[in-house]
Amino acid sequence: MELYEAISYRKSIRNYSNKGIKSSLMEEVKGLCNDITYLNEDLNIKVHVIDRGHLIQFLMGKACEVKAPHYIVITSNKGDNYLENIGFVAEEIVLRLISLGLATCWLKCDLKREDVLEFIDLEVVDTDDEEYENKIDAPYAIIAFGYAEKEESLFRSVNSDPDRKRLKKVCKKIDRKWFKVLNSVRIAPSIKNIQPWVFYSNENGFDVYEKKTKKSIANESKISMGIALKHFDIACKNFNMDIKFENIGAKRKRGKNYLMSIVDNEKNTTKE
């Protein structure tokens, strides 16, 4: 299954078999977790496979609502749009796992750096370093994965429409060229299904905004924005559409924060 197809078929699985995945498959998972790309190359994002799921369950306690045999923990230092970049990285991992026939579920991460040091190797930063707070790595996202319980359907029916906003709520003034790409964004998962993304068309592509949300889920909302950008990126690659992500600034909009712009390179080439 291609990543673009996985976008339409994916769904969150909350019930897992206790059986661990095969060792050969686990090696494949670890390999793809080491092969990641993100938008801000100054960040130090890493994806850690925790094959002993009980470690995460113990640390999270009652907050661990999804019991799975394995988990993935994503760590990063703080930097420009680090949470959005985490979402961008992790959603591709999720879609690749789905393509391998594995169930997945995003979890809210309340773990701290000191919680995971015993089983995750994080870089040491001198506490006297003036940039200590921005350089130090910490966990920000968790993904449960494994084999789904027998009664759980791994994939969503291609004909079913998830509980999402209509496309006109996602983007204003849609060019038909972008319809399928933006629909891939529309069906992206988000914290509490808030779907915080809004795309505004401009002569060069799109300006992307995040709707302001409650402080209690602000971090997860930013991660959700990164997930939406990854869906946009995958769909563009599927249709051979040449784009780039840039932070070029845009007008302020009430109740929304500007994230970045998406430039249609094909349109700019035509202009030249």
For each of these PLM feature ranges, what is it?
Residues 1-272:
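Acidic, surface-exposed loops and disordered segments
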